[in-house]
């Protein structure tokens, strides 16, 4: 996620572009949402000076980053939503009996988020279990 009024945010999120997977993007503001199929399409629109007049304030990109990791500002993860869900599950254990850790995009993460996959999975499990 990132704020659209932060000039460096577009360059930061552009580092996540890679051709293997689609990374849908949604913007919100003024009670409306705009949807983009993939990051390059979104970046082209967001960089257009006319876009600023649409009142969009925040953008979120579909990209599975490790829960234990936080991207460099001005980007941020949305793992607080996962934390809320895990908090709910603590008091409602019947809500979910298993968890899935999605790792398929980890191999195409920007370099500063790259680690050996076994280490990433171990850290991901550690983070999830620490929340339970």
Regions found by a protein language model. Give the residues of each.
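Histidine-acidic metal/acid-base catalytic patches
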Residues: 1-132
